């Protein structure tokens, strides 16, 4: 077993994906699983079959808060956070992260892999010809950290519930050490598949949650890092476009589209008013 790296997995209704992943690396690395969906079946299976895995329940206060909580149980020099819907993270690729960390003499803030199934518009990546390439941002789906440096930076900002927490971390981290994409670590990210959705109602509620938090977090990120005045000027056209779409879909009777933009309006307006990211799945 490697005693330099701990693998951190955040599970939210992701039992099968989590089990499939840990079966590939169970006896190779220390593993911490943080579950914020109160998955008792996953807990029972871990306790029965994987005695050396640390399993913890946590109140669902968001992705960043869960990772910060997990980091308090990390007692290795490095740790890797990995979404259950990532394919390609195995012993070989984890050791590549470790090799790069040592090659850089630990002078990095975070390391990330190359995503093979994403387009350049939605996910900016580095020149694949450069193996260790500086990046402004690393995707939160898979990030490799030096534990001490992560702690010194204060971890993730827990004001973010969903989206932009890794962007905020990388922006802060970049002022101290660089973030790097490791292009010979190639993975696939099946975005949105980590949560097992039981029915259409759950699917719709999850989509509402994502719409609300994306716009809330985007405004909060800009306000925090670039100031209130800049953020207001930047987002006022966005707000007006949302209002116009709400008006248009009200007149045309498109209830589904109207609801979508009402959710975006509420998320952005709440963030502009300085309200917390308190949107949750309806019971």
List where the protein language model places each region.
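Short, well-formed alpha-helical segments that are part of the catalytic scaffolds
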Residues: 9-27
